[in-house]
Amino acid sequence: MAYRKLGRDSAHRKAMLREMTTQLIMNERIVTTETRAKEIRKTTEKMITLGKRGDLSARRKAAAFVRNEIADIHEEKDAVVVKSALQKLFSDIAPRYKDRNGGYTRMYKLANPRKGDAAPMVIIELV
């Protein structure tokens, strides 16, 4: 399987991809460099596909990759509801794409590169 090294060793690269994929699931839009976004797109598509499957095996595979962070806190009636990134993936995001076969993310190139190293920046978001 081909992938980009992104100037990091394998553990650092995997941690970065896990973190950025989790942030994309939680916020549904992030700003990052173009090469990172292309890699995040792959992992996010796989996680959403697992979310669409929705069985126990898919939940365990997604839980092994997506970080356990709080995605949403809101009040319903007299209770405070706390939703993790994994719960948001399976209950909110996956049902949204039940009739869509892939292509869950979209990338927009930003006009101005990053200051300092002139890296091309993009916005990656869920469709």
From Swiss-Prot:
What keywords are assigned to this protein? Ribonucleoprotein, Ribosomal protein
**InterPro entries this protein is in?**
Ribosomal_bL17, Ribosomal_bL17_CS, Ribosomal_bL17_sf
Give the UniProt record's GO annotations in the biological process aspect.
translation
Q: Is DNA-binding one of the keywords UniProt gives this record?
A: no
Keyword Ribonucleoprotein part of the UniProt annotation: yes
**Source taxon at top rank:** Bacteria
Task: Write down any Gene Ontology CC term.
Answer: cytosolic large ribosomal subunit
Q: Which family does it belong to?
A: Belongs to the bacterial ribosomal protein bL17 family.
Task: Spell out the subunit comment.
Answer: Part of the 50S ribosomal subunit. Contacts protein L32.
Q: Which NCBIfam families match?
A: L17 (TIGR00059)
Entry protein name: Large ribosomal subunit protein bL17
Source organism (scientific name)? Lactobacillus johnsonii (strain CNCM I-12250 / La1 / NCC 533)
Q: Which gene encodes it?
A: rplQ
